[in-house]
């Protein structure tokens, strides 16, 4: 992203367009639940008839509808936080064409197998309405397939070539690639990053055309060539649970965890704050009585703290306010990465949030082929509604308590996903602290690793 593009796109040269007046707009996509929930026992309507926290139904795929790797899935709608369940999910088989069709002889010689195959699981946690999450669920896998097909020649090579289509300009090109340490997995990571960016642009166009607003986080797992790639943009989370190990597979991106990046942007482009916010962080919101006093603060270049004398400009609302799950960017948004939010502005202002948001995911690679897998080794992916009330250790305890005693049950991973959600609802046998209930939408995938590569009978 060039500085020139950034200035043209986000900085005042011309006045920002006035906010759209409220009014009815057609959604760019119809509201729906994930395709693999069709035929499930709970009604697929927009909202459940009863939304009391103690009576919200948990939904899972119907018996006989098998997800990739026999993964389990469950979800629950929020407790009257919004009209719709703003979470979305998608999963299926990735079929990546290995080369373009040419003469039959060339095809038979170069491509003994037409497709490189993998699997895909994704969770999208929407905000500001369900539209962005639905668009992401409909779009991201197609973006990823296109990006992977563009680099498939490098994926199937022993070492990614410097040039595609077999060209070699410099005899030492393979050495340069080797010295850079470029591997096939780096091409998959690049494809994921580019797919997120492409999907973000699609969502922006669709929502703008329909006069809609909204965004979503995205947590995506991709299995390809014996490795599991976990791409995260937002505050959903994935962990690997084994008999003697709990391994985080994602990092949560919030205004607090990305404070320095966000402050740095405000330092370079102060116009983005429109004179209404201070980029500096203080332990609390400053008051008039703090003027002239030396107080603790930190800026974009600081991981530690120092003291400064309070000036009038320091009394403005902080760029990042609150801590933990309560931290907000420009008093508005609880995440710093995701898809969408192109039209989002601070209430009653023309101050845009999109310049501070990234659609680029962090990608973690799990080399599944190198693990000595046990039958009960699983990856748990969930939106933040689960992690708001359950820790990694509590989730792992539930996994280890349930799976060993149910190894003959073909639906055990689905039942485990349901049990994890029930544990967020404050039941008497729940692990959560007394009275601790998740009122948010909650969506969970439980992906067993022992059956990796097993074909799904229904995608």
Swiss-Prot record:
Catalytic activity: O-phospho-L-seryl-[protein] + H2O = L-seryl-[protein] + phosphate; O-phospho-L-threonyl-[protein] + H2O = L-threonyl-[protein] + phosphate
UniProt-annotated binding residues for Mn(2+) 1: 125-126
GO terms assigned for molecular function: [pyruvate dehydrogenase (acetyl-transferring)]-phosphatase activity; manganese ion binding
Family of this protein: Belongs to the PP2C family.
Organism from which the protein derives: Homo sapiens (Human)
Biased composition (Pro residues): 14-27
EC number: 3.1.3.16
Residues reported in the UniProt entry to bind Mn(2+) 2: 125
Listed GO biological process terms: protein dephosphorylation; signal transduction
GO cellular component, one term: mitochondrion
The protein's required cofactors: Mg(2+); Mn(2+)
Protein name according to UniProt: Protein phosphatase 1M
Segments forming domain PPM-type phosphatase: 162-459
């Amino acid at each position: 992203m060039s500085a020139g593009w950034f200035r043209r796109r986000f900085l005042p040269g011309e006045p920002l367009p006035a906010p759209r007046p409220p009014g009815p707009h057609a959604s760019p996509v119809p509201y729906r639940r994930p395709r693999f929930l069709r035929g499930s026992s709970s009604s697929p309507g927009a909202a459940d008839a009863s939304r009391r926290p103690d009576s919200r139904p948990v939904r899972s795929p119907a018996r006989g509808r098998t997800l990739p790797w026999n993964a389990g899935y469950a979800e629950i709608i929020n407790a009257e936080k919004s009209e719709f369940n703003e979470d979305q999910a998608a999963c299926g088989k990735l079929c990546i064409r290995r080369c373009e069709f040419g003469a039959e002889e060339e095809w038979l010689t170069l491509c003994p197998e037409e497709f490189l195959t993998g699997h895909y699981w994704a969770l999208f946690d929407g905000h500001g309405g369900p539209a962005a999450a639905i668009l992401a669920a409909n779009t991201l896998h197609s973006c990823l397939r296109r990006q992977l097909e563009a680099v498939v020649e490098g994926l199937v090579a022993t070492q990614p070539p410097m040039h595609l289509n077999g060209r070699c300009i410099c005899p030492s090109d393979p050495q340069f690639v080797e010295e850079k340490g470029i591997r096939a997995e780096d091409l998959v990571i690049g494809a994921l990053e580019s797919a997120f960016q492409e999907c973000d642009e699609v969502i922006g166009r669709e929502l703008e055309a329909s006069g809609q607003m909204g965004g979503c986080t995205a947590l995506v797992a991709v299995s390809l060539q014996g490795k599991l790639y976990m791409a995260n943009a937002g505050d959903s989370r994935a962990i690997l649970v084994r008999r003697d190990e709990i391994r985080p597979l994602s990092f949560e991106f919030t205004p607090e965890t990305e404070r320095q990046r966000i402050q740095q942007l405000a330092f370079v482009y102060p116009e983005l704050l429109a004179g209404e916010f201070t980029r500096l962080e203080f332990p609390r919101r400053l008051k008039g009585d703090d003027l002239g006093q030396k107080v603790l603060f930190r800026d974009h270049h600081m991981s530690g703290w120092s003291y400064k004398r309070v000036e009038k400009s320091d009394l403005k609302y902080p760029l990042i306010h609150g801590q933990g799950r309560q931290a907000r960017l420009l008093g508005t948004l609880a995440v710093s990465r995701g898809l969408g939010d192109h039209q989002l502005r601070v209430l009653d202002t023309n101050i845009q949030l999109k310049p501070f948001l990234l659609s680029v995911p962090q990608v973690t690679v799990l080399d599944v082929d190198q693990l000595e897998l046990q039958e009960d080794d699983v990856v748990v992916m969930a939106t933040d509604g689960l992690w708001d009330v359950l820790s990694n250790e509590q989730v792992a305890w539930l996994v280890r308590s349930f799976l060993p005693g149910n190894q003959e049950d073909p639906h055990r991973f689905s039942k485990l996903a349901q049990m994890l959600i029930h544990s967020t609802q404050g039941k008497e046998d729940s692990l959560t602290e007394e009275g601790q209930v998740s009122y948010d939408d909650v969506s969970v995938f439980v992906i067993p690793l022992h059956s990796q590569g097993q074909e799904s009978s229904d995608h």
